[in-house]
């Protein structure tokens, strides 16, 4: 299983540098599952568009893409001194930061790249540019380690809940899988670590919400779990309560794009209603979150900006003919906020946090 799993991860590397290290090589996730196509991004406009149009998506993967994007585009800056170089670098940073307003990893990665440049400012510009590539590589490597740690902690929860001879039922929403990170994913990491620890794909039964309107659960999560050999069922978002009531779901794992200091968590639209259902049916609900997604400057969910997306995603994007009348107003937020009191725990790479979350974040030095 290890070789098969390694081959799978190699096939679906989300973001990497080109062999010449002059561009980003990404999977265009808007084409999945029907077409698996890699595209090369070299300009800041191409990178901005790829993030904005969800060709690369998922908070950790966005952070990695932004870091590499900043390194690649900074490499082309022509400047006489560090001051001029830094001015151009900040312009690139601010431009890339405008692509997605909710994913805090985007800003975290860009700020980290800026700080690395400042730390090298007394050295030659060639050295500064090389340092940016080094920092981006480090961000990617750290993301792999972070996802693996989250997976180990989540796998520990699965082991406690699994009954001998029966698959454990897991529900997830949207895609917080390996396609959303450098490797393993966050919400899917416990499943992949289970395989690494010797479980069979049939020891788990993962139920994927399709995740309207962009269908990340159907197009991406179901795609990658099926390819990894894990028993997978796809359902419409409004079918989750039937599954929970029937006793088929034993635990819920989702990812997130930003966590407020009180534990309120922004994730793909529809996550909050899954948490409400899980609470009603007594099912543990866990957010899987790298500590970089915890925004200590954000007091609660009311302060998390929510991206509004195109009405076409709801009315006509997936259909041969328009499925709603012309002129109808469309409400299409990309995210919702799950209230902290609905969350059983937040699994970070440093440990599992419980309410009161601010105290646990401090205990783990997040």
For the regions a protein language model found, what residue spans apply to each?
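Positively charged, low-complexity intrinsically disordered leader regions
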Residues: 2-45
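Conserved phosphate- and dinucleotide-binding cores of soluble alpha/beta proteins
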Residues: 203-204, 210-366
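N-terminal active-site beta-alpha-beta segment that forms phosphate/nucleotide-binding
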Residues: 55-232
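Small-aliphatic-rich amphipathic alpha-helix that forms the alpha element of a beta-alpha
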Residues: 49-56, 62, 273-276
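Short beta-strand segments
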Residues: 27, 65, 107-109, 171-175, ...
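Short, glycine-rich nucleotide/cofactor-binding loops
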Residues: 40-44, 175-181, 261-266
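Short, hydrophobic/aliphatic alpha-helical segments
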Residues: 39-55, 89, 168-172, 317-327
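Acidic-glycine-rich active-site phosphate/pyrophosphate-binding loop
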Residues: 35-46, 127, 164-168, 221, ...
